[in-house]
């Protein structure tokens, strides 16, 4: 794998930090915002993000998707309010580290099949989990921009921080 396990965990933890930074920019009066009728609302997107990464990481680690675990996590996510959802997302950094703690380099190179597609465990972690986190937080960023947060920029999206003030 091109990334070390520590780098993968660090990248997933960085995604968590970026997501929490962006979520902190949400105007609570706009939690029901959705770009079109068929898309998730801001709150629905956050709830999905509160379970997607850890659940797919677990699937990759175990080499099998657990629909019952996903359903339970989805039910719990749907019951959370905004603050509870952010609190759950805040646990992801530790969750990723715990889920990947006992995964060896050999485990990362092992082939698994998920959702009808085979690849190495490491590649699936990158393509499904890490890429998914980046994609969905970018969707949240676009929602924020659509809701008038014009001051948000590349620093917010990729570094998870506001642009530093000029000296």
Model-derived segments and their meaning:
Residues 1-11:
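Extreme N-terminal tail/first-helix region
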Residues 5, 82, 126:
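Flexible, glycine- and charge-enriched loops at secondary-structure boundaries
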Residues 9-24, 30-73, 113-167:
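Short, contiguous alpha-helical
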Residues 29-30, 106:
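Secondary-structure boundary/capping positions in well-ordered alpha/beta enzyme cores
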Residues 58-103:
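Helix-adjacent hinge/juxtasegments
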Residues 101-116:
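Acidic catalytic patch
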């Amino acid at each position: 794998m091109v990334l070390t396990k520590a780098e993968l965990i660090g990248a997933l933890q960085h995604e968590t930090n970026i997501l929490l930074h962006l979520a902190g920019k949400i105007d609570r009066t706009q939690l029901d915002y959705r770009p079109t009728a068929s898309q998730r609302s801001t709150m629905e997107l956050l709830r999905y993000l509160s379970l997607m990464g850890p659940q797919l990481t677990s699937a990759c680690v175990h080499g099998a998707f657990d629909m019952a675990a996903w359903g339970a996590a989805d039910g719990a996510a749907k019951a959370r309010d905004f603050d509870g959802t952010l609190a759950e997302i805040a646990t992801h950094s530790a969750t990723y580290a715990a889920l990947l703690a006992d995964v060896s380099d050999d485990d990362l190179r092992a082939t698994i099949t998920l959702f009808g597609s085979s690849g190495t465990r490491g590649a699936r972690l990158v393509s499904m989990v890490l890429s998914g986190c980046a994609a969905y937080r970018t969707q949240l960023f676009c929602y924020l921009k659509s809701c008038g947060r014009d001051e948000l920029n590349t620093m917010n999206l990729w570094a998870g921080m506001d642009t530093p003030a000029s000296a």
